[in-house]
Amino acid sequence: LNIDGRVAYTGGFNVADEYINRKMRFGVWKDAGVRITGPSVLNMTSMFLQIWYAVTGDGSDFRSFIRENEELPAKEGFVQAFSDMPLDDEAVGENVYADLISHAQKYIYIYTPYLVLDSYLTQALCQAGRSGIDVRIVTPGIPDKKIVYLLTRSNYGELLEAGARIFEYTPGFIHSKCM
């Protein structure tokens, strides 16, 4: 969600009664999102427009959607927005996650409804666990997609052997995707 190029929200929020716990299909629904202001909103706008153009072919002049960055007070840290889409062969998301995992010094905490890992990320997490990094993963204990739930659980063994700790959220469904 991008509002006037000033504020952006990103996360796993869906729109339906079950996602605001009005209707309880899987128990209490847990999700996470982030509100972004500052220069990264421009990145979020650009990512949206790239996907918009790829899907619609709309070649309009999008300059009106791009706001000039305002001078902001210096702060410690930064936000780097990135997108990973099926329209190219780049594994941006996987590379970002692998880099974050390999540079962890104390802990790696992951919330995910769908722990579907390839060997590259599995090995990165296992190496972190074996090197003494506190690796904790929270997945749903109540599945919304049974096949994906079984696939998620099939990844547990190797991770547990490497020292990761895995928790299943049982009061409902955890839809958060956070690391």
Q: Which stretches of residues belong to each language-model region?
A:
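Charged, low-complexity intrinsically disordered terminal segments
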Residues: L1-M179
